[in-house]
């Protein structure tokens, strides 16, 4: 029996609050919750309940002994939030650009899906506090999973950000899925030139329908930071597992370091720019950030997309490097071992790449620390083969930067100069010992 037939037979509707008695290890177990519609990819023989703690549970129909309806679903009257949405002349204007993810979302009880909340009224319902901080202007640019983000999307975001800032907004918040947020933050950091106002990327590790969601606080802190004096691209996410404060990370030095923790984002080889509290308190952790100004931002969106990011591993074949050469790639960023090494038997292929005008850059898969190709013989061979050591750049940042650099020049000496030039805080001038695993 499918769940639709089961519900019809039992005279149960979507949204009803019910009690389910199921068999588990020979004993009866009781669950109470709201009936959710079957999800698109859920098994057809599974009843989904939203428990009172906010979490969903699936129960196989074959295990259900009986069900009882405790309360019928009620149609809630629409609440209008014009008072929140109406602009206030004393507040700054902030545009929130939606690209996907679950930073602000709502449950559709007809389909069971969680959709982005991106009209002004939907945002007011989801996170009304942000309308007390700024006049919010929401714009849904596109709605895709962050793993589907491509360079063309970075460019589209950059132009929309510039348009908003140059029209008088105090700052811009970009709502983005967390998985590839670091790549987009780096891309915007390089493309948005003469930036004079804050650009914040924000996401949520846990969606808004979960009681442990970090979405609301992240969004509140992001809007707070978007009105600050920092004229940089930043990622604002939870600073610890509780709901105390968020951290504002520089866009070129931030990485997602955990699959599910709310404080998954960390500044690597560097200190975050600030701690941000939902009540508006901002504690700056450094003073070398770019200050707010009246400059007009412009978009330098020349990107060479034929760039690869290759991770070194024991047994890696030179055929991988040869593949990218033969396919006409213009750049390769290598995540080397330790100080930036590869097996010696792939160095001839790397040399072939540089001799054919392909830029090859070296980062470290250690994540923390700095590439140094002068210490061991392997590193010196890589230098001789023409490899560009990328200091303490994150592999993701070096990948994005090489795309941007190659969009401006194919001359390898000029590529080397630009890769080793610090454009957006991607290179720290010295190795800090107070940032490791912080």
Swiss-Prot record:
GO terms for biological process: amino acid metabolic process; regulation of translational fidelity; translation. GO terms for molecular function: asparaginase activity; ATP binding; glutaminyl-tRNA synthase (glutamine-hydrolyzing) activity. It comes from the Archaea. The active site is at 102, 178, 179, 256. Allows the formation of correctly charged Gln-tRNA(Gln) through the transamidation of misacylated Glu-tRNA(Gln) in organisms which lack glutaminyl-tRNA synthetase. The reaction takes place in the presence of glutamine and ATP through an activated gamma-phospho-Glu-tRNA(Gln). The GatDE system is specific for glutamate and does not act on aspartate. Belongs to the asparaginase 1 family. GatD subfamily. Its EC number is 6.3.5.-. PROSITE patterns: ASN_GLN_ASE_1, ASN_GLN_ASE_2, ASN_GLN_ASE_3. Keywords: ATP-binding, Ligase, Nucleotide-binding, Protein biosynthesis. Pfam families: Asparaginase, Asparaginase_C, GatD_N. The gene is gatD. This is Glutamyl-tRNA(Gln) amidotransferase subunit D. It comes from Pyrococcus horikoshii (strain ATCC 700860 / DSM 12428 / JCM 9974 / NBRC 100139 / OT-3). It catalyses: L-glutamyl-tRNA(Gln) + L-glutamine + ATP + H2O = L-glutaminyl-tRNA(Gln) + L-glutamate + ADP + phosphate + H(+). The keyword ATP-binding applies. Residues 92-422 form the Asparaginase/glutaminase domain. The keyword Protein biosynthesis applies. SUPFAM superfamilies: GatD N-terminal domain-like, Glutaminase/Asparaginase.
